[in-house]
Amino acid sequence: MIEVIKTYPLATLISVKNEEPLITHLPLIYDETTGNLIGHIDLYNPQAELLKNNQPVTIIFSGPQCYISPSIYTTTQLPTWNYIKVHLKGHVKSINDSEAIKNSMIKMTEFLEQPDHKYVLEPDNPRMDGAINYVKGFEISVTHWEGKFKLSQDKKPQDIVNAREQLIKTNQESIADFLTKVF
């Protein structure tokens, strides 16, 4: 599950205020030493005020997913959908020290720039200094992990291979097609 988080760090962060869910999509990185998730959010995001005092949160990470046609199988099957998801629950505490927030932003940038590291966010970056007053840093202590991996694993070996190839092919093609249409 950690590999899903590292490979697909854009998370869906869910908090609840007055029985109303607040949902934000933002990158979170996994800290190998603490086992916590680290992130930051725009201070004016309504969810920011809930990211403190050990408030409960739910986090969802999404890996590749696609429709699987029965036509790819060597055996008779029904249409299905394959996907990889990781559901986490935890408690969040705020990071209030501006240097600690900067360090978390630098650490996140280092992680996201892998493997080439074409950009380095320097601690004295004036844009970061200007933005730091508008960002709330936070850390999530994960209390519950749940992997949701539906990958045709109940099929025959060749059908599993075919489903894997379809998942790879469909994701590559759908990304290219979608971005061509909207970007």
Residue ranges and their predicted role:
Residues 1-6:
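Hydrophobic, proline/glycine-rich low-complexity stretches
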Residues 8-43:
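Short beta-strand segments
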Residues 9, 24, 35-37, 53-57, ...:
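A generic structural signal for short beta-strands and their flanking turns/coil linkers
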Residues 36-57, 165-174, 180-183:
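An N-terminal domain-start capping segment
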Residues 44-104:
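Short, structured beta-strand-loop surface elements
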Residues 95-183:
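C-terminal edge-of-domain segments
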